[in-house]
Curated annotation (Swiss-Prot):
Protein known as: tRNA U34 carboxymethyltransferase
Catalytic activity field: carboxy-S-adenosyl-L-methionine + 5-hydroxyuridine(34) in tRNA = 5-carboxymethoxyuridine(34) in tRNA + S-adenosyl-L-homocysteine + H(+)
Keyword terms: Transferase, tRNA processing
PANTHER family tied to this protein: TRANS-ACONITATE 2-METHYLTRANSFERASE-RELATED (PTHR43861)
Gene assigned in the entry: cmoB
Enzyme Commission number(s) from the entry: 2.5.1.-
Organism: Vibrio atlanticus (strain LGP32)
Entry's Gene Ontology molecular function annotations: transferase activity, transferring alkyl or aryl (other than methyl) groups
Subunit structure: Homotetramer.
Job description of the protein: Catalyzes carboxymethyl transfer from carboxy-S-adenosyl-L-methionine (Cx-SAM) to 5-hydroxyuridine (ho5U) to form 5-carboxymethoxyuridine (cmo5U) at position 34 in tRNAs.
Length: 323
C-alpha cells in the first residue's frame, strides 16, 4: 500500500493547495482499493530497493544518481534486476549507480526543446499532467522548482517514480499521484502547468485546455506539447481508428489551430515555440522497453507516413499565459 501522508501534510501547509484535501484522500483510497494484476509483484520489488543516501545527484543536465561509495558488482546486478521488474520503461533516461536505464523515449531531447522557451522555474510550484514516470519532474527540480506535482493514472509509472525517488533519498519536493486531470478540483494553485503528450488522448480537447487553465494562478504559464499536423488554423486530423497503432487518440490539430483553441478558451500571449518531426532516434525499442516502438509504427516504404497512412508523428510546443 502507498502512503500519501507526506503529501497531505505538505498541501495542508499550502493555502493554495489546501482545498484539495476535501476530495483527495477519498480519491486515493478508492484507487488503493481497486485491484491491478501486477501491482503486488511490483510492490514486492519496490520494497527490496535500498533506500538511497546519494551524494552525487545531477538533475540539471540529466537524471543521475551516484555515490562516492560505489555499489559492489553483486549489489548492482541485484538492483538492475529489480528495476527491470518494472518493464517497460518508457520515459527517461536515468543513470542510477552506473546502471543506465535506456528508456523507449529520449525524454531529455524533449526537455531540451522545451526549456529555452519557458519562464524560469526557480521557486515555482509546478503541475505536470500526464507525467509518465516523472522524468520531467526531476528535470524541473533541476531548474529550481519549489514543488513538482505529477498526475498520471498508470500504476506502473507510479512504481517507477517511487523507485527512483527511493534511490534519490526520498526527495519530498516531487510527488506523483495516480489521478487523471478530470479528478482535480479547480485549484488555481500552480505557477506553471505542463501538459505534454496528453491532448490527443482527450475526447474533448477544449475541455482539457480549460481544465489546465483551472489549475493555474492568474499570470501562470501553460506549457503544452502534443502531436500536430501541418496546415492552417482550420486543419485538424481525426483518425477513424488507430494512429501509429494507438487506439485511444482523437484530435490532431495543426499548431496554428491549437493556438486558436488556446486563445478561444481564454489564454493570452500564445506562442508556437517549436515544431519537430519525431525520429526513430528519439523513440525506439531498447533493453528496458522491448515491445514495438516508432520504427514499427511507420510505413516501411514511406517513413513520412504511419502504417495507417496518416502523416508521421510531428510534435509542437506552445506556451501561453492565463490572464
Amino acid at each position: 500500500m502507498f502512503n500519501f501522508a507526506n503529501f497531505y501534510q505538505l498541501i495542508a501547509q499550502d493555502t493554495r493547495l489546501q482545498p484539495w484535501l476535501n476530495v483527495l484522500p477519498q480519491q486515493l483510497t478508492d484507487w488503493q482499493n481497486a485491484e491491478h494484476g501486477d501491482f503486488d509483484r511490483w510492490l514486492r520489488a519496490l520494497n527490496k530497493i535500498p533506500q538511497g543516501v546519494p551524494d552525487q545527484v545531477d538533475l540539471k543536465n540529466s537524471v543521475t544518481i551516484g555515490s562516492s561509495t560505489p555499489f559492489h558488482t553483486g549489489e548492482l546486478k541485484k538492483l538492475e534486476s529489480l528495476l527491470k521488474t518494472f518493464h517497460p520503461w518508457r520515459k527517461g533516461p536515468y543513470t542510477v549507480h552506473d546502471i543506465h536505464i535506456d528508456t523507449e523515449w529520449r525524454s531529455d531531447w524533449k526537455w531540451d526543446r522545451v526549456l529555452p522557451h519557458i519562464s524560469p522555474l526557480k521557486n515555482r510550484s509546478v503541475l505536470d499532467v500526464g507525467c509518465g514516470n516523472g522524468y520531467h519532474m526531476w528535470r524541473m527540480l533541476g531548474e529550481g522548482a519549489r514543488l513538482t506535482v505529477g498526475i498520471d493514472p498508470s500504476h506502473l509509472f507510479l512504481v517507477q517514480f517511487e523507485a527512483i525517488r527511493k534511490l534519490m533519498g526520498d526527495d519530498q519536493r516531487a510527488h506523483l499521484l495516480p489521478l487523471g486531470i478530470e479528478q482535480l478540483p479547480k485549484l488555481e494553485a500552480y505557477d506553471t502547468v505542463f501538459s505534454m503528450g496528453v491532448l490527443y488522448h482527450r475526447r474533448s480537447p477544449l475541455d482539457h485546455l480549460i481544465q489546465l487553465k483551472d489549475q493555474l494562478v492568474s499570470g501562470g504559464e501553460l506549457v503544452l506539447e502534443t502531436l500536430v499536423i501541418e496546415g492552417d488554423e482550420n486543419a485538424v486530423l481525426v483518425p477513424v481508428d488507430r494512429y501509429a497503432q494507438m487506439r485511444n487518440v482523437y484530435f490532431f490539430p495543426s499548431a496554428r489551430a491549437l493556438k486558436r483553441w488556446l486563445e478561444q478558451v481564454g489564454f493570452e500571449d500564445v506562442r508556437i515555440v517549436d515544431e519537430n518531426v519525431t525520429t526513430i532516434g528519439e523513440q525506439r525499442t531498447t533493453d528496458w522497453m522491448t515491445h514495438n516502438s516508432l520504427p514499427d509504427y511507420l510505413d516501411p516504404n514511406d517513413p513520412s507516413k504511419t502504417v495507417e497512412g496518416h502523416p508521421a508523428p510531428r510534435r509542437a510546443i506552445l506556451v501561453a499565459t492565463k490572464p
